[in-house]
């Protein structure tokens, strides 16, 4: 189960990525990171860029294309079947922390995410201040503040 400590640890990374399909919720989370002046890379295999408030930001097709994966925390906004592949790649690359938005995980995803040594921080599930569980849009500022980034 995620805690304030796991959320805080997520935000200790110097780099961030948002992995998901090009949908409103993915764009909203990416914009949230930009609004908070965090170094964020959008990850989307189907789009070369994303536009936020009239400015284009280049995407990368997968986590392997991130410049510093071992220093990057990743927000995941995908269907559970897709999340499994994202987690497998993240684990292989040594990504330290993941934040799985509500609706992105099931039992098989949690088994992989919570496997011993897979990640140093996994934020997911019940808790946080939102009614659907831990959400970076709802709980991110508090965790950033606790990590000294606000």
Predicted feature locations:
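Structural motif
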Residues: 15, 72-73, 97
């Amino acid at each position: 189960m995620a805690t304030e400590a796991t959320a805080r640890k997520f935000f200790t990374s110097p780099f961030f990525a948002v992995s998901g399909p090009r949908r409103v919720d993915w764009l909203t989370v990416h914009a949230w990171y930009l609004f908070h002046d965090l170094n964020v890379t959008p990850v989307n295999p189907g789009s070369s860029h994303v536009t936020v408030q009239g400015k284009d930001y280049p995407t990368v097709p997968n986590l392997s294309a991130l410049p510093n994966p071992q220093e990057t925390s990743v927000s995941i906004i995908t269907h559970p079947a897709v999340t499994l592949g994202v987690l497998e790649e993240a684990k292989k690359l040594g990504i330290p922390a993941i934040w799985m938005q509500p609706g992105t995980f099931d039992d098989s995803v949690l088994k992989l995410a919570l496997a011993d040594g897979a990640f140093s921080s996994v934020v997911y599930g019940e808790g946080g201040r939102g009614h659907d569980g831990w959400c970076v849009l709802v709980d991110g500022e508090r965790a950033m503040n606790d990590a000294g980034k606000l």
